[in-house]
Curated annotation (Swiss-Prot):
Gene3D superfamilies with a match to the protein in the record: Cytochrome c oxidase, subunit III, four-helix bundle
GO cellular component: plasma membrane
EC number in record: 1.10.3.-
Catalytic activity: 2 a quinol + O2 = 2 a quinone + 2 H2O
Protein name listed in UniProt: Probable quinol oxidase subunit 3
Length: 201
């Protein structure tokens, strides 16, 4: 989807400044998740597991459901932004609602995953690896939850006052945020789950 200076999200100077500010904010987010990843990867090789190994606990089908839900939501979010730039409000809202639903599916399964680990006696206190695991996954899950609330608030605003050059940049910014979280999840899926299914300690 090409960026056009005449699209509804690019018609105001304030909107463009907000986008620039958000890109700067994302650099801090990259630093945050980079630090969490570095910590977990270090502890993945030599950290304490408290006798609870990832090779025994990680469930591929559950992880795949979460992954597909989040990746498909990135696609539906992209479609929503396309329709936003076409100024087709109803179609934009439809695809953003689908995005929210998929996000809720992801969060729901992540809560289930954490509950499953808790039932197996796994918690952040049993070993350094699990502590870093729950911090990384919990931080990402909290960001996804925040993104869902953010989108819902914007959809309410747009539904009330209509799509305009004031709220369109906000919608574009939240789409960047959502895609960023999808990228983070791809790294989690690869570095945490895929490695964890074949190696512990």
């Amino acid at each position: 989807m090409s960026h056009d200076a005449n699209t509804i999200d690019s018609r105001t100077h304030e909107g463009e400044l907000n986008k620039l500010g958000f890109w700067i904010f994302l650099t801090a987010e990259f630093a945050l998740f980079g630090t969490l990843f570095a910590t977990l990867l270090t502890l993945q090789h030599g950290g304490g597991y408290g006798g609870k190994l990832t090779t025994d606990l990680f469930e591929l089908h559950l992880i795949l459901i979460m992954t597909f839900a989040l990746l498909i939501s990135s696609y539906t979010c992209g479609i929503a932004i396309y329709y936003m730039r076409q100024e087709k409000q109803n179609l934009m809202m439809f695809w953003m609602i689908i995005t929210v639903i998929l996000g809720l599916v992801f969060v729901g399964f992540e809560i289930y995953e954490f509950a499953h680990y808790a039932s197996e006696g796994v918690n952040p206190t049993i070993g350094s690896f699990w502590s870093s695991f729950f911090i990384l996954l919990g931080t990402h899950g909290a960001h996804v939850s925040l993104g869902i609330v953010w989108v819902i608030c914007l959809l309410i605003q747009i539904g009330t006052r209509g799509l305009d050059s004031y709220n369109a940049p906000k919608l574009f910014i939240v789409s960047l945020y959502w895609h960023f979280l999808d990228v983070v999840w791809v790294f989690i899926f690869t570095a945490v789950y895929m490695i964890g299914m074949v190696y512990s300690g």
